[in-house]
């Protein structure tokens, strides 16, 4: 089965709940998907269905199996046609919900008195009892509508808003979506983990990949302090979500002892594939790599005959030193012998001194893209790049997407949108000519293109 099209085992997916909140779930064999108050189901029951399928959790009434460590009853699942069918009554829905076809409505809310819980005959205890009896969410909502004394005095639009709120609270369905870099970014934003991703927005991430011209078979230099989110997006651009056989390498430079690529665990790439195409080098190793003579002087690999004669208790130390030897040679190759197709930097370090040094190994006529959540940081960097002949046309960009919400006859922006998504600086690495070609002589530039006409001599 194709993990980009279908739900497969040992895959991380993004589950969208009735409340539109997101949750990351790993599909372990014979496991259970627990969604809290929205119910639970077995993983094996959804395997093989296409990604994007909406499932409804339902109960026959005799279920006794519960999630370990909780009181959530595990139910069965059935497929809904689409999420809009389960979410009828939302603001964007055009047809009238089935729950409201038998209910009267009012043209205005003039006769409606907002008395809160006093107009609802069902109290909190009865609703909790129905939830414990695993009553279907639609049944609970229908009983609440029937028990509402002033529901018929609401307008159609007000009734749909009421129905939407109740579905977000009591409905038992979910949508299984593909967990890509964009979905992972939306999950982290919703979770409120903004410092971890440096206030990065989905629009800024896509713009950075486009400006850097990320594609397959490329070799890219990256400094990612978003936990591996940018590296994950680059892998998707280069390999399309598949563990393809074609080439391509991402060299990640990190400032700490070990790289922080924790978010790559949510990708569907294996550790072997990531280790083959993602190489990590510390800043100290990149700027001051050891020489080949120093590495070869510190260790000499043994041939097969010498290795067979070595005692078994010394082979462990030998293989550790051999691994370090090969690692040092790899660092020398990455830091000294490769020119890169692009540079992407998302770091909290001083960019005005960091980027010019990192760009030294970028090939000519290749893009350089830097991200920061602060405009002043990139302004300082742009002044530094303008003073150098190795960088062409540094440009500062700001991405902003303004979502709109619609109802019948109305269109207005979403009132709870984010403030911004950071800033990007983009330029090209160029190699100045050594022989003076292309330079303009200021003195000659001011001279006229042709000699001025002389006045006729007097006879």
Curated annotation (Swiss-Prot):
Q: Which GO terms describe its cellular component?
A: nucleus; tRNA (m1A) methyltransferase complex
Question: Which example biological process does GO assign this protein?
Answer: tRNA methylation
Keyword set includes tRNA processing = yes
Give the record's keywords alphabetically.
Answer: Nucleus, RNA-binding, tRNA processing
Q: Where in the cell is it found?
A: Nucleus
Task: Kindly indicate whether the keyword Manganese belongs to this entry.
Answer: no
InterPro entries of this UniProt entry?
Answer: TRM6
One of the record's GO molecular function terms: tRNA (adenine(58)-N1)-methyltransferase activity
**Protein purpose:** Substrate-binding subunit of tRNA (adenine-N(1)-)-methyltransferase, which catalyzes the formation of N(1)-methyladenine at position 58 (m1A58) in initiator methionyl-tRNA.
Q: Which family does it belong to?
A: Belongs to the TRM6/GCD10 family.
Subunit composition?
A: Heterotetramer; composed of two copies of TRM6 and two copies of TRM61.
Q: What protein does this entry describe?
A: tRNA (adenine(58)-N(1))-methyltransferase non-catalytic subunit TRM6
Source organism of this protein record: Eremothecium gossypii (strain ATCC 10895 / CBS 109.51 / FGSC 9923 / NRRL Y-1056) (Yeast)
